[in-house]
Protein backbone atom coordinates (compact mmCIF):
# COMPACT_ATOMS: atom_id res chain seq x y z
CA UNK A 1 0.00 0.00 0.00
CA UNK A 2 2.41 2.62 -1.23
CA UNK A 3 -0.33 5.25 -1.43
CA UNK A 4 -0.78 5.25 2.34
CA UNK A 5 -4.51 4.58 2.39
CA UNK A 6 -5.86 3.18 5.66
CA UNK A 7 -7.27 -0.26 4.82
CA UNK A 8 -8.78 -2.94 7.06
CA UNK A 9 -8.86 -6.39 5.43
CA UNK A 10 -10.99 -8.92 7.30
CA UNK A 11 -10.12 -12.29 5.84
CA UNK A 12 -11.59 -15.71 6.47
CA UNK A 13 -9.80 -18.79 7.74
CA UNK A 14 -10.65 -22.39 8.49
CA UNK A 15 -11.62 -23.47 11.98
CA UNK A 16 -9.14 -22.89 14.80
CA UNK A 17 -9.18 -26.67 15.36
CA UNK A 18 -7.46 -27.08 11.98
CA UNK A 19 -4.95 -24.20 12.07
CA UNK A 20 -2.09 -26.31 13.42
CA UNK A 21 -2.15 -28.90 10.66
CA UNK A 22 -2.04 -29.07 6.90
CA UNK A 23 -5.65 -29.03 5.84
CA UNK A 24 -7.77 -28.04 2.85
CA UNK A 25 -7.86 -24.23 2.43
CA UNK A 26 -5.65 -23.59 5.47
CA UNK A 27 -2.66 -21.35 4.91
CA UNK A 28 -0.61 -19.03 7.08
CA UNK A 29 -2.33 -15.86 5.87
CA UNK A 30 -0.96 -13.76 8.70
CA UNK A 31 2.67 -14.55 7.88
CA UNK A 32 1.93 -13.99 4.19
CA UNK A 33 0.45 -10.53 4.92
CA UNK A 34 3.09 -9.32 7.40
CA UNK A 35 5.51 -7.88 4.79
CA UNK A 36 2.78 -5.78 3.16
CA UNK A 37 0.79 -4.73 6.22
CA UNK A 38 1.32 -2.52 9.25
CA UNK A 39 -0.27 -5.14 11.52
CA UNK A 40 -1.81 -8.60 11.10
CA UNK A 41 -3.70 -10.58 13.74
CA UNK A 42 -5.81 -13.74 14.00
CA UNK A 43 -8.85 -13.60 16.28
CA UNK A 44 -8.63 -16.74 18.40
CA UNK A 45 -11.46 -15.96 20.84
CA UNK A 46 -14.82 -14.32 20.11
CA UNK A 47 -14.57 -12.09 23.18
CA UNK A 48 -11.52 -10.40 21.59
CA UNK A 49 -13.26 -9.36 18.34
CA UNK A 50 -14.14 -5.81 19.41
CA UNK A 51 -10.71 -5.09 20.86
CA UNK A 52 -8.79 -6.49 17.88
CA UNK A 53 -10.94 -4.72 15.26
CA UNK A 54 -10.64 -1.41 17.14
CA UNK A 55 -6.86 -1.85 17.34
CA UNK A 56 -6.71 -2.57 13.61
CA UNK A 57 -8.54 0.69 12.84
CA UNK A 58 -6.31 2.66 15.21
CA UNK A 59 -3.12 1.30 13.64
CA UNK A 60 -4.38 1.60 10.03
CA UNK A 61 -5.33 5.27 10.52
CA UNK A 62 -2.20 6.29 12.45
CA UNK A 63 0.61 8.01 10.53
CA UNK A 64 1.72 6.58 8.14
CA UNK A 65 -1.64 5.00 7.27
CA UNK A 66 -1.70 1.54 5.76
CA UNK A 67 -3.10 -1.97 5.64
CA UNK A 68 -4.12 -3.98 8.71
CA UNK A 69 -5.24 -7.59 8.33
CA UNK A 70 -7.67 -9.28 10.72
CA UNK A 71 -8.06 -13.01 10.21
CA UNK A 72 -11.39 -14.47 11.36
CA UNK A 73 -11.55 -18.28 11.62
CA UNK A 74 -14.91 -19.78 10.64
CA UNK A 75 -15.72 -21.17 14.11
CA UNK A 76 -15.07 -17.78 15.76
CA UNK A 77 -17.17 -16.01 13.10
CA UNK A 78 -20.19 -18.19 14.02
CA UNK A 79 -20.14 -17.24 17.71
CA UNK A 80 -22.80 -14.78 18.86
CA UNK A 81 -21.33 -12.22 21.23
CA UNK A 82 -23.07 -9.69 23.44
CA UNK A 83 -20.76 -6.77 22.96
CA UNK A 84 -20.93 -3.19 21.78
CA UNK A 85 -18.30 -1.44 19.72
CA UNK A 86 -15.75 0.51 21.72
CA UNK A 87 -16.09 4.28 21.57
CA UNK A 88 -13.37 6.08 19.64
CA UNK A 89 -10.74 7.74 21.77
CA UNK A 90 -10.11 11.41 21.10
CA UNK A 91 -6.41 12.18 20.86
CA UNK A 92 -5.04 15.66 21.28
CA UNK A 93 -2.00 16.25 19.13
CA UNK A 94 0.91 18.04 20.76
CA UNK A 95 1.79 21.53 19.59
CA UNK A 96 4.88 22.32 17.58
CA UNK A 97 8.19 22.91 19.32
CA UNK A 98 8.68 26.69 19.46
CA UNK A 99 12.44 26.48 18.88
CA UNK A 100 11.97 24.32 15.78
CA UNK A 101 9.33 26.72 14.44
CA UNK A 102 11.67 29.68 15.01
CA UNK A 103 14.51 27.85 13.22
CA UNK A 104 12.25 26.99 10.28
CA UNK A 105 11.08 30.61 10.12
CA UNK A 106 14.68 31.80 10.02
CA UNK A 107 15.58 29.32 7.27
CA UNK A 108 12.64 30.49 5.15
CA UNK A 109 13.48 34.17 5.66
CA UNK A 110 17.12 33.63 4.68
CA UNK A 111 16.45 31.38 1.68
CA UNK A 112 17.04 32.98 -1.71
CA UNK A 113 15.19 30.36 -3.74
CA UNK A 114 12.94 28.22 -1.52
CA UNK A 115 10.39 25.73 -2.82
CA UNK A 116 7.53 23.81 -1.18
CA UNK A 117 7.19 20.09 -1.90
CA UNK A 118 3.66 18.98 -0.98
CA UNK A 119 3.13 15.30 -0.24
CA UNK A 120 0.17 13.02 0.39
CA UNK A 121 0.01 14.07 4.05
CA UNK A 122 -1.46 17.40 2.94
CA UNK A 123 -4.38 15.48 1.43
CA UNK A 124 -4.72 12.96 4.29
CA UNK A 125 -4.77 15.70 6.91
CA UNK A 126 -7.02 17.96 4.82
CA UNK A 127 -4.41 20.71 4.89
CA UNK A 128 -4.63 21.75 1.23
CA UNK A 129 -6.42 25.03 1.91
CA UNK A 130 -3.88 26.05 4.56
CA UNK A 131 -1.07 25.04 2.22
CA UNK A 132 -2.51 27.21 -0.57
CA UNK A 133 -2.66 30.18 1.82
CA UNK A 134 0.97 29.55 2.83
CA UNK A 135 2.11 29.37 -0.81
CA UNK A 136 0.26 32.58 -1.64
CA UNK A 137 1.40 34.50 1.46
CA UNK A 138 5.05 33.49 1.14
CA UNK A 139 5.12 33.70 -2.65
CA UNK A 140 7.01 30.41 -2.78
CA UNK A 141 6.65 27.95 -5.66
CA UNK A 142 4.84 24.75 -4.77
CA UNK A 143 5.18 21.29 -6.30
CA UNK A 144 2.78 18.40 -5.68
CA UNK A 145 3.72 14.73 -5.55
CA UNK A 146 1.43 12.41 -7.53
CA UNK A 147 -0.57 11.57 -4.40
CA UNK A 148 -0.88 15.25 -3.45
CA UNK A 149 -2.24 16.48 -6.77
CA UNK A 150 -4.38 19.53 -6.20
CA UNK A 151 -2.98 20.45 -2.80
CA UNK A 152 -1.28 23.36 -4.57
CA UNK A 153 -3.80 24.39 -7.20
CA UNK A 154 -2.58 24.21 -10.79
CA UNK A 155 -4.34 27.57 -11.28
CA UNK A 156 -2.13 29.28 -8.69
CA UNK A 157 0.63 31.43 -10.20
CA UNK A 158 3.10 29.79 -7.77
CA UNK A 159 2.22 26.25 -8.85
CA UNK A 160 5.01 24.19 -10.36
CA UNK A 161 2.54 21.36 -10.95
CA UNK A 162 3.29 17.70 -10.20
CA UNK A 163 6.71 16.17 -9.80
CA UNK A 164 7.30 12.89 -11.58
CA UNK A 165 9.92 10.28 -12.07
CA UNK A 166 11.54 11.72 -15.17
CA UNK A 167 15.04 13.03 -14.61
CA UNK A 168 14.53 15.85 -17.11
CA UNK A 169 11.35 17.26 -15.57
CA UNK A 170 11.39 21.01 -15.08
CA UNK A 171 10.09 20.38 -11.56
CA UNK A 172 13.25 18.43 -10.75
CA UNK A 173 15.31 21.35 -12.04
CA UNK A 174 13.38 23.68 -9.74
CA UNK A 175 14.28 21.50 -6.78
CA UNK A 176 17.91 21.26 -7.93
CA UNK A 177 18.13 25.06 -8.11
CA UNK A 178 16.45 25.59 -4.75
CA UNK A 179 18.46 26.46 -1.65
CA UNK A 180 15.65 25.28 0.67
CA UNK A 181 13.08 22.53 0.12
CA UNK A 182 10.16 22.79 2.52
CA UNK A 183 8.62 19.32 2.59
CA UNK A 184 5.04 19.39 3.86
CA UNK A 185 3.15 16.14 4.22
CA UNK A 186 5.88 14.28 2.38
CA UNK A 187 6.34 10.64 3.37
Task: List where the protein language model places each region.
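N-terminal alpha/beta PP-like core and its mobile active-site loop of ThDP/TPP-dependent enzymes
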Residues: 1-187
Amino acid sequence: NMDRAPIIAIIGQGSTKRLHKESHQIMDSIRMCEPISKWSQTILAAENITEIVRKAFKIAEAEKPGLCVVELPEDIAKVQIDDTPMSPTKVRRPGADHKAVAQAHELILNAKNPIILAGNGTIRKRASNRLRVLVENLGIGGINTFMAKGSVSYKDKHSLFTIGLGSGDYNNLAIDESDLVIAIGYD
